[in-house]
């Protein structure tokens, strides 16, 4: 069974359709990169999987939990809460609590939401900080960290919930260029662990080299998808070729 399955997903903003019946499957352990121009629906699709956006219709399944978005969301709050416990989400703007330390940011979810014991959550948080290269930053506040360090804390925070799936929404777009590499390296290490991940990104080389599969979206539709290296090397659709033209010429 696939880790994620999206069927016939439709989303509208102010009467305008921004996702036109999207179908998507992600296998367990697969890394999928979603690319495309700004406004193509990439982030909306990602946020819909976690029900941060409420679609008009379609179904979303993560593991064994299925949400029918055509039904009132108020009647499915318990299901949505359970689904979110299986899905980690890394935002482009970090979304760390500014008045809590790095350690407090990471243990909040496991202790408050999942009911884990605090000493165990702290021990795991320290392990995760080591994984993302932030040993010794436990007591730091977000304002004392660079953007790249804050994003790596956000990744550790997502991992602390032991998610089955991790969604990344343009995780490097808010970073200074010299800080991008450290975040991409952290995500690359997770890919090597065969974690199930969906990554919306403008980092084309990263998408080509790290993803198993790439999806190109435009105007709320999936235009083309395929094995990542093949899609970048030889896109089949004219719109995909047009989008990738500058990248392919490098």
Task: Label each residue range with its predicted role.
Residues 2-228:
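ABC family nucleotide-binding domain
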Residues 219, 225, 229-250:
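C-terminal boundary and immediately downstream tail of ABC-type ATPase nucleotide-binding domains
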């Amino acid at each position: 069974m696939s880790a994620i399955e999206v069927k016939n997903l439709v989303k509208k903003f102010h009467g305008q359709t921004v996702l036109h019946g999207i179908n998507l499957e992600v296998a367990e352990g697969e890394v999928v990169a979603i690319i495309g121009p700004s406004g193509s629906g990439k982030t909306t699709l990602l946020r819909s999987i976690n029900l941060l956006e409420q679609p008009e219709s379609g179904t979303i399944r993560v593991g064994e939990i299925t949400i029918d978005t055509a039904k009132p969301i108020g009647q499915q709050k318990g299901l949505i809460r359970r689904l979110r416990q299986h899905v980690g989400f890394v935002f482009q703007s970090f979304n760390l609590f500014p008045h809590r330390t790095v350690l407090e940011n990471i243990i909040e979810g496991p202790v408050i939401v999942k009911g884990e014991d605090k000493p165990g959550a702290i021990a795991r948080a320290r392990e995760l900080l080591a994984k993302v290269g932030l040993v010794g930053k436990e007591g730091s506040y977000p304002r004392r960290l660079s953007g790249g360090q804050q994003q790596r804390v956000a990744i550790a925070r997502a991992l602390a919930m032991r998610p089955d799936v991790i969604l990344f929404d343009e995780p490097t777009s808010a970073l200074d260029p010299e800080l991008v590499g450290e975040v991409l390296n952290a995500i690359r290490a997770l890919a090597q662990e065969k974690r199930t991940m969906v990554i919306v990104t403008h980092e084309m080389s990263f998408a080509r080299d790290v993803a198993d599969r790439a999806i190109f979206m435009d105007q709320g539709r999936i235009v083309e998808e395929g094995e990542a290296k093949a899609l970048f090397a030889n896109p089949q659709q004219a719109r995909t070729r047009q989008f990738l033209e500058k990248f392919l010429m490098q």
